[in-house]
Regions:
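Divalent metal-dependent hydrolysis catalytic cores, especially in the metallo-beta-lactamase
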Residues: 1-3, 28
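Active-site beta->alpha loop and helix N-cap motifs at the rims of alpha/beta catalytic domains
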Residues: 3-19, 36, 40
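Alpha-helix N-cap/helix-start and coil->helix boundary motif
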Residues: 10, 167-168
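Catalytic domains of carbohydrate-active enzymes, especially glycoside hydrolases
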Residues: 19-31
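Catalytic core of soluble alpha/beta enzymes
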Residues: 30-166
Length: 168
């Protein structure tokens, strides 16, 4: 289980991250995607504050373009920030951009907003546009389509993450 750290000032994000760790969370989902250079600084400050034992996931919220994504993710890799994955770095429809990124970085890329249906999952997996698939029941239309996506991913050896959209 992860907890989301909303994009904010570096100091506020570090404070929110430390608070989450104090409450027992060991996986933080860091929201970024507004300012590339500043995004790297945010992640670096959080990593320094929480230490190496806490998993960091980065959600760019479709906020970067493909080349910018490669530069930012490469910078995080070069700094040894040990990011578990980067979620949806580019616009949902930009599967060429996703593939461009996936081919050029070592950090796993998670498709989220790009996957609404089993057909989307097949296309993303076969094209090499992502390393991982994020499934949200509200987004996929319920448990049955979500299970189909899981089955498809399993056939291709692709891991899935199950998330939510704060539905009630």
């Amino acid at each position: 289980t992860d907890i989301t750290i909303s994009v904010n000032s570096i100091d506020q994000m570090v404070s929110d991250s430390l608070d989450a760790v104090r409450r027992g969370y060991r996986t933080l989902k860091i929201k970024v995607g507004k300012e590339g250079v500043q995004d790297v600084a945010r992640i670096a400050a959080i990593r320094k504050a929480v230490g190496p034992e806490v998993l960091l996931r980065v959600d760019a919220n479709q906020g970067w373009d493909a080349r910018q994504s490669v530069a930012i993710i490469s910078a995080m890799e070069d700094q040894g920030l040990d990011i578990e994955l980067v979620e949806q770095p580019v616009k949902a429809h930009d599967l060429e951009g996703m593939r461009y990124i996936t081919q050029r970085v070592q950090t796993p890329i998670l498709a989220d907003e790009s996957v609404f249906s089993p057909a989307d999952a097949i296309h993303i997996i076969q094209s090499g546009a992502a390393d991982l698939i994020n499934i949200k029941l509200m987004k996929t239309g319920g448990i049955w389509p979500a299970l189909k996506i899981c089955d498809i991913a399993e056939l291709y050896g692709v891991e899935c993450i199950i998330g939510c959209m704060l539905e009630s």
